UniProtKB/Swiss-Prot annotation:
Zinc fingers (unnamed), renumbered ranges: 8-39
Keyword DNA-binding: yes
Compartment(s): Nucleus
Tissue spec. comment: Sperm.
Single Gene Ontology MF annotation: zinc ion binding
Signal peptide extent: none
Protein keywords: DNA-binding, Metal-binding, Nucleus, Zinc, Zinc-finger
GO cellular component term, pick one: nucleus
InterPro entries the record matches: DUF5679
Species: Sepia officinalis (Common cuttlefish)
Entry protein name: Epididymal sperm protein E
Superkingdom to which the source organism belongs: Eukaryota
Amino acid sequence: ARSFSSYCVRCRRKTPSFNSKTVTFRNKRRAIRSHCAYCQVKKFRIIGHGG
């Protein structure tokens, strides 16, 4: 997927993301799972309901 920025809890700021993938939680909510470009921690960005 394309590169985007999202909030990193460890860095405490918006950081670029890499290795992003769309996932669906058990409650049918969709999110983008990615990693922080600086500290490599896993982070999620909620993108809405799955239907």
